[in-house]
Amino acid sequence: MERGRTKEILGLGILSSMFFAVTFILNRSMNLSGGFWVWSAVLRYVFSLPILLVMVGMRGKLKPVWASIRRSPGAWFLWSTVGFGLFYAPLTWASDFGPSWMTVSLWQLTIVAGVFLNPLFGKPVPMKSLGAVAVILLGVVLLQSQEIASNGGGREALICVGLIAIAAVTYPLGNRKMMVLCGEELDTTQRVLGMTVCSMPFWLVLGCIGGAARGLPSTAQTVQALVVAVFSAVIATLLFFQATNLARNDPRQLSLAEGTIAGEIIFTLLGGVLLLHDPLPGAVQWVGIGVIIFGMLLNCRAAR
């Protein structure tokens, strides 16, 4: 039973990582074509909202979402803003500072954050996962060392790391807080819809800032943001949250679910190089990517 659940969690996580890779590739594409990162972030959630409303509404399950929000509006708006707003805004901004494969490789810091968030929810840190955490951190250092050395201190590389570190903490934190708040009352799609609705004030403010700073987005950026909304904000997020829902009561399996996002590295590297002509990683960076993937595999093994 548990082995079958582990396989299901692993399969859902890897599938979600393939769809999440679209985010990194298209965010970089929008950046290279002159699109403002603020609109890339805002439009993803603006477009995903009506899609989710239709998905939940067709099943007649909207009322439980509104009822849950009315009972705990403060918690809903806070953790939705943390889990979606403070996750995706810095992650999108980070695409300004390097190729898509670098951004997605650094995003594996989520695995590290996920392990150390357990005590906040009354669960122990999975000791078997600590070795994987150390390996992933080593990979991150190797990945950025060449960038820093070749850019006289690597200010942009450090900014990129800082932005992704923020996203790596806020995403699992917001997700887990909302799982605790909702319990079994809402399914994954309902929870994602509720979080999208409650993060809208954040996106409205950010959109006003974007409009004042750079004007409205281009048609090309708008279309690409729509694709990101469908593939990443809806499909990938639902798959990932379903995996974490299955693992919610087992800290080892929860770390496994969150660890599968490392599959994004392979999908994004291939897409970035083939579609965007991103520069290939240097020798040390290849080693760093390999070390990060090895850390993911160690984390999966620790969860068995």
Give the positions of each predicted feature.
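C-terminal-most transmembrane helix of multi-pass membrane proteins
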Residues: 41, 45, 254-304
